Amino acid sequence: MYILDKLVVLLRLPKAVAGELVRLWTIDDHTYCDLVKSWLGYHPALMQDNYTLQTEDGITFYLGFGTYGKDYTSWSMDAKLEFNPAKVGNSRWFKNLYQMLIQRSKFIDFRRFDVAIDIPVPRSQLRLLKDNRKYTLLDYGGENRTEYSGVRSNHGQVKVYNKALEQGLETDLTRIEITVDYANSSWRE
């Protein structure tokens, strides 16, 4: 079985949208999810205003506004939404937020996603073949090991780990996650 495990969407929105959402979160309005935490980003690769949000079921996701260091003298600003569709897909709160963001956006870029493949075998029966990319092995003993090939959150990164251990399952389940950057992918891949 495979699923879309993580999706990163870049948007260009009117500046007023961020203000409206923050106002709703501060008055504890549950139309567009609950605010868990907020922080400022001080690096060009980060968003300036960052938020961890929570659905009515307690599932968290990320929303950021304004690329750090970019001048936003016009009416619009960048936004970044990062979420797991399999987890938030049934949330009424998330659907409200997502629909509002998509409707108000002047630009939408489905930037990056992870494809997760679950295989019902013990983790010890699968090995990640090394190539010339960065390779990392986190071995905690027995079935508790995670292998990475490639740079984190970059196109082509592969991660193999024991999903059964993570989920506390009695059956064997190993997950392979592949990161795909839409701009760098091709149909041949």
Which residue ranges define each predicted feature?
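Structured, helix-rich domain cores that form ligand/interaction pockets
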Residues: 1-189
